[in-house]
């Protein structure tokens, strides 16, 4: 219907690039004198927040084998929105070399891809340590350079904008039950 098949994995590469931002986050547990007890790498995976909350809540019996360790982060793509403010002419093209010949390439269509990053922790201080390691890089955006279309060598600087941070703590439930 629309034309010739193509798949440059642009959305996939964008998702991977977003996740890579949060790969190397650690937290530390310290004694009151400042001595480090634990240096913990925070796990990261792609998937919806509700999936991880359900898994964590299934672990009510603490003697069971560990299925998810906390703290942990998950992220997911939650929207794709057209951005008319970045629109260029429909027929505008640019030339790109693929090593042997020049190719005529149409301008990309501007879309904003929304993500949600969720942080799960047993201790409030763990969550605050994670947030404090993320916030300074976003003022309010952080720019990633992504190799979007390898066939033509198209690399783009993609700004990742931190819109807001919201907190959710489940205070409901039985006394003695772990809260996430």
Residue locations for each model-derived region?
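Short, charged/polar micro-motifs that form catalytic or ligand-binding hotspots
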Residues: 1-8, 116-125
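Small/polar-rich, solvent-exposed N-terminal microdomains that initiate assembly or binding
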Residues: 1-92
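Short, well-ordered alpha-helical segments
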Residues: 13, 17, 126-137
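Catalytic micro-motifs at enzyme active sites that drive phosphoryl/nucleotidyl and oxygen chemistry
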Residues: 60-65, 99-107, 169-174
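Oligomerization/assembly interface segments of phage tail-like spikes and tubes
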Residues: 71-79, 107-123, 132-134, 176-179
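Short, solvent-exposed secondary-structure capping/transition elements
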Residues: 83-86, 124-131, 143-147
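Active-site-proximal segments of catalytic enzyme domains
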Residues: 87-90, 95-105, 110
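Acidic-leaning, charged glycine-interspersed low-complexity segments
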Residues: 107-109, 129, 136-179
